[in-house]
Amino acid sequence: MSIKAEEISSLIKQQLEHYDDKLDIEEVGVVTYVGDGIARAHGLNNVLSSELLQFDNGAYGIAQNLESNDVGIIILGKFDDIREGDRVKRTGRIMEVPVGDALIGRVVNPLGQPVDGLGEIKTDKTRPIESKAPGVMQRQSVNQPLQTGIKAIDALVPIGRGQRELVIGDRKTGKTSLAIDTILNQKGQDVICIYVSIGQKESTVRAQVETLKKLGAMDYTIVVEAGPSEPAPMLYIAPYSGIAMGEEFMYAGKDVLVVFDDLSKQAVAYRELSLLLRRPPGREAYPGDVFYLHSRLLERSAKLSKELGGGSLTALPVIQTEAGDISAYIPTNVISITDGQIFLQSDMFFSGTRPAIDAGASVSRVGGAAQIPAMKKVAGTLRTDLASYRELESFAQFGSDLDQATQAKLARGRRTVEVLKQPLHKPVAVEKQVVLLYALTHGFMDAVSVDDIARFEQELYTDFDANHADLLAEIKSTGKLPDENKLQEALQQFASSFSSSNK
């Protein structure tokens, strides 16, 4: 069979019509050094800062140091099978993590991969871990309270939705417990919680996840876990991954609480990476941009304007101090970035005052505006009363001849300290806190012995739940104190029955 020349030419024309002249150009570098979670690569001349890079073995890295002859890369995940001479290519993207409702109730690593053994996370939404914080005009003032359920915080250092409140203290002073209790209290408050664990022991994180599950808090919580055995880059990116997951909900108009436990370990991981990348060390061997490390993270916490949906992201960063030294480099940095701090003191903790919140050193710079009017009224003088009690207490040790007024102040102070104590994982609803503090400030506890204050508190809640639920409901719905005559009458009835049963 002979093929005609015109048929050949028409076939060639057809082929040429459908020919797609597309070239895939990849910029590829060669690994010249690898170790301790970092790599150096030669040949990536056009790579951008913070660009995501991919190694031959499928592992990813982030370009950190752009130098004249090579690029310093931090490796995300295992680096055992990356060798000198391996290829590394540009992706043209920046690091992103999966986000959305599918992550709620799950435990993930900083890359958003599940580590809880409950199967893959089905979501097609992602967000970059680094994003610009909302500007001044995209925000509004903090105006809604975030109830922690911890009496000492809600009364003395109130937190608002969209605020950044630092939790600071030595090791073993109850910082993590305080954060977990705050998450537990968000049940039924329509707040999504994200707990970012940085460098915490895996057994500790497991125990916390079990606590959250047992008390029904995993229904609205995501846990991001970077254990101490993970390479330093994972600890470094963990907070950014956590806040990116939170931003997805914030920009959807929801309220989010993100706990970073703790940022001291992230700073140490960043110091390690910076020294390995041969960046010049500064104070305490931290690099010069360690302030920016935390400021660019915490500035992403905001209460968005109504035009953007009015969502909020509240940040609770945790910082560990050494021997109560809050004037060290990282603590002072984070104190200056945040809107207040809750200082936990080891002396108070070991003497049995738990939560061990030092009312004198703790402050909330914006939360007062978000406090409900009823709480503002009953807790108004509490801080000054506590401060004067501490002062009087130190003077009272030197002499026993105290006048009546001073003795009354000391007695009220002892009861105040006792009222602010709280057992672990037992958050108190704000309306009950208001009633309790009203009873304290109006003298209904003056006749109760200090040892009986805890029992007085529990029986007061039981009595109000049974006989005065309307008063509690009114405080909850309006945020204001109910008719004071009714409230005083109810408290008088209870106080008289309590004291008579004690005689």
Curated annotation (Swiss-Prot):
It comes from the Bacteria. ATP binds at residues 169-176. Its EC number is 7.1.2.2. The keyword Transit peptide does not apply. Keywords: ATP synthesis, ATP-binding, Cell membrane, CF(1), Hydrogen ion transport, Ion transport, Membrane, Nucleotide-binding, Translocase, Transport. It is found in: Cell membrane. The record marks 362 as: Required for activity. It catalyses: ATP + H2O + 4 H(+)(in) = ADP + phosphate + 5 H(+)(out). Coiled coil: none annotated. It is an enzyme of class 7 (translocase). It is a peripheral membrane protein. The keyword Lyase does not apply. One of its GO terms (cellular component) is plasma membrane. GO terms for molecular function: ADP binding; ATP binding; proton-transporting ATP synthase activity, rotational mechanism. Produces ATP from ADP in the presence of a proton gradient across the membrane. The alpha chain is a regulatory subunit. PANTHER family: ATP SYNTHASE SUBUNIT ALPHA, MITOCHONDRIAL. F-type ATPases have 2 components, CF(1) - the catalytic core - and CF(0) - the membrane proton channel. CF(1) has five subunits: alpha(3), beta(3), gamma(1), delta(1), epsilon(1). CF(0) has three main subunits: a(1), b(2) and c(9-12). The alpha and beta chains form an alternating ring which encloses part of the gamma chain. CF(1) is attached to CF(0) by a central stalk formed by the gamma and epsilon chains, while a peripheral stalk is formed by the delta and b chains. This is ATP synthase subunit alpha. It comes from Lactobacillus delbrueckii subsp. bulgaricus (strain ATCC BAA-365 / Lb-18). The lineage of its organism: Bacteria, Bacillati, Bacillota, Bacilli, Lactobacillales.
